[in-house]
Amino acid sequence: MVALFPAPLTPLGGLDAALHARGFAVLDAASVAALAGVARTDFDALLPSWEDLRADEYLKDGGRYRKRRHACCIVAAGVVHPVPHRMHYQPVEYNALHGGMQRWFAPIDASTLAQPAWPALVLALAGACSRQRPDVVRWHVEAHQFRIDTSDGVGRPTPEGAHRDGVDFVAVLLVARHAIKGGETRVFAAQGPEGQRFTLAEPWSLLLMDDARVIHESTPIQPLDARGGHRDTLVLTFRAAGFLGD
């Protein structure tokens, strides 16, 4: 058994206050489902899509450990509006390793986006962001499905290190941990000494962050045995001022 640092869970009713007070909040899966207004098991309809991700061809460390898919949408007036498939871009100020270039990833499959849990989750998270920023009428959302595996011996969820994403809010949902150690989440105040370390271990648990106020990273993963392992996540970013790179 690998010892894990427990996540500092926030009750659902305290989500807005925690996000306002410290710049991040962690919800368990039951709270995420309640926030989205779906059954916990509805999220499981999304799981098969993590078995069909595509290799990340842009890794500058030469690794083969990351697979992913990408999609974008706009949320306005309580409606999710899909947008044509587009590139993912981050300035070098936010991603010194992979920033400053257009990266085109395989799109998230239409059947995944059509699952009822998908728009329910996106709208619920957009609502949480809007309660922090009631002036925002339109959120530009990027969704990233990730699988980090141990095919290279070590998999790096954040090869760029501790970082901000250059957006307004970042949501990280743990989808699965299989036969690994590591993958510890670390969240630090962007201005100040405060920080916390913990492990998201429950499928569909959530870390929601105010990107201007905290920086974050996840530590490398290693396999528990020779058969290898992986860590699956869903990352959604919310930005008021358009998509990065526009």
Where are these regions (language model features)?
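N-terminal auxiliary "cap/dimerization" subdomain that precedes the catalytic jelly-roll/cupin core
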Residues: 1-92
